[in-house]
Amino acid sequence: SAVSNRGEKFDPAIQPTLNMYNEYFGGGMNAIVFQEMRESRGLAYSAGAFLITPSKLKYPYVYRTFIATQNDKMIDAMKAFDEIINNMPESEKAFNLAKDALITRLRTERITKSDVLWSYLNAQDLGLNTDSRKELFEKAQTMTLPEIKAFQEKWVKGRTYIYCVLGDEKDLDLKGLSQYGPIQKLTQEELFGY
């Protein structure tokens, strides 16, 4: 798992593109991350990457990635992941699948019961007074892959990360892992409190 925080604050103008980027790049089984890491390269059981929208105005955007892989494939998986994050593969077919999936989800998603209140309060926490899904739905219709690439270049490429690796130390390539920065080993008690 890796996390990157550059301190960027909430910007409603980027939200439609951010949502489409997440759908295209890091979303489900048709997303670039899953297709590249699992299907094409066989380096992961599961993988994902998302630019996470802050829940309040005072919080920053955070980029979060995860890879579930075998210990002996860890370094290769990390290198491949860094490569596709910084040099995002472009596939018009995958983009159209992502676009259709996002539009379909927006068409069928309903906010009901107590979720109406929670959605309203969450919007208020971000300084919004309308349902942001409306703008997302409208902009998604005409969004293009070059727009997603430009977003990736500005908001994702070149980030620095804090990595978290879980595994049996004797099975991990610590020398290879050290190329990503200093290694800090944590005990079970430090992680879980027992």
What residues fall within each predicted segment?
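An aromatic/glycine/proline-enriched structural segment found at the starts
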Residues: 1-6, 165-194
